């Protein structure tokens, strides 16, 4: 973001963005760089046709996540990519939540920049990630970090070729090796099979949580157009206390709060308290979900 945008530029972002996008954009506001938020429904549904009216002469790019890390809603990047193509806009997509779960075709979706993290659906260690970049955007992007690369060491200038121009300093070799092992596992197990299992568990959880009247699902109520992430809000209770009890009393790990995505919570009407987020793995079971539901029953029977 900081290597692409110049004073006077304007970008469009979704209303579900993570602070990984929003904080750089807000920092750039002091440099006369501005953004407009694409409206979404309260379940995160974003309509591509609402974008064209927001495009200005100075609009340079559309930046958005592929799927919400809060509620799992999948955004229509194929249709939005086509709009970017027609209007000659760069299209940057954050796939932190979707990489390793669903197929993404950069060319078909007209994606110029695709960022991913290794520690979620790709099952790698924390602290490793990367990006893919189109040739057109590579010519526009200014590297922000300079340093040793182990290549062209006789030059005081950074190499001008990929990937060295963007990779300064000692690489995170343990992270790279860990991610490589994870990718090998994913290839052997099969991403479609893993995704199917996760969505079956998500559907089961969405069905069973209806038995808990105190719980409100923030986001889509079914498995359509979503990933295996479910956020719950308990309007009459303290979400943090419930999450603490789930961990201490039942051994159930969740993530509670705003998930580094306050704009998403504004969209979902769960600000300022946030939600309790459940993210299902193919290693989970329906029996574990049943234990969670039983835990909720016990908590609310006191």
Positions of the model-derived regions?
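Pyridoxal 5′-phosphate
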Residues: 1-302
């Amino acid at each position: 973001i900081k290597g692409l945008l110049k004073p006077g530029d304007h970008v469009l972002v979704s209303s579900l963005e993570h602070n990984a996008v929003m904080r750089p954009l807000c920092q750039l506001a002091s440099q006369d760089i501005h953004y407009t938020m694409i409206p979404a429904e309260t379940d995160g549904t974003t309509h591509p046709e609402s974008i064209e009216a927001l495009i200005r002469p100075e609009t340079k790019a559309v930046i958005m996540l592929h799927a919400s890390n809060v509620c799992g809603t999948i955004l229509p990047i194929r249709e939005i990519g086509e709009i970017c193509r027609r209007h000659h806009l760069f299209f940057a997509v954050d796939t932190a939540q979707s990489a390793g779960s669903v197929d993404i075709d950069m060319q078909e979706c007209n994606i110029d920049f695709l960022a991913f993290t290794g520690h979620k659906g790709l099952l790698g260690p924390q602290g490793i990630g990367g990006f893919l970049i189109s040739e057109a955007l590579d010519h526009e992007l200014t590297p922000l970090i300079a340093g040793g690369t182990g290549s062209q060491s006789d030059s005081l200038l950074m190499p001008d070729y990929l990937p060295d121009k963007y990779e300064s300093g000692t690489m995170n070799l343990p992270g790279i090796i860990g991610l490589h092992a994870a990718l090998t596992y994913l290839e052997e197990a099969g991403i479609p099979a893993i995704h199917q299992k996760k969505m079956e568990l998500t559907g089961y959880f969405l069905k069973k949580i209806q038995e808990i009247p105190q719980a409100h699902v923030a986001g889509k109520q079914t498995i359509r157009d979503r990933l295996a992430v479910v956020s719950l809000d308990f309007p009459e209770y303290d979400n943090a206390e419930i999450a603490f009890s789930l961990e201490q009393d039942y051994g159930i790990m969740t993530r509670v709060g705003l998930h580094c995505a306050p704009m998403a919570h504004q969209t979902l009407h769960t600000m300022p308290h946030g939600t309790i987020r459940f993210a299902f793995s193919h290693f989970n079971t329906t029996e574990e979900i049943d234990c969670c539901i039983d835990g909720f029953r016990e908590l609310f029977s006191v």
